[in-house]
Amino acid sequence: MNIKNKLSPAVIKTSLQGTTKEEVIRELLEVLVEAQLVTDRETVYEALMERERKMSTGLQHGVAIPHAKTTAVKSLVACIGLKPEGVDFAALDGLPSRIFIMTLSPIDRVGPHVQFLAEVSMVIRTEEARERLLQSKNAQDVLSVFGL
């Protein structure tokens, strides 16, 4: 999988407004709906929240990767949202999440989701890359961190 096939300015939001996990998830989902990548908003929201109930997708270093499998997408879709002040996402390290990468994949496919997350992880593994993301003023700044 090539990350550049999944990321574009249409799926990047550099100033999330949500202040709770639920609000951030809804806001990111709306980005995908507006980009016409999701066919059923509520089905996807329920799938995302069910995943969060099983185990938080808040990782470490201010990164959260809300994700779900759903019938509402035909192939893997993704979006990126930033909130420099952070939101409590019940992260593994207890710190607020500030970088959000949402992925949705079809129920019957595993590979693309894992490949996409591996590629993203390679980019955001350094503090320098995460700081560059958080300082992004627009979608093109975000894409440049990913080499796009």
Model segments located where?
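Cytosolic covalent-transfer regions centered on His/Cys nucleophiles
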Residues: M1-L148
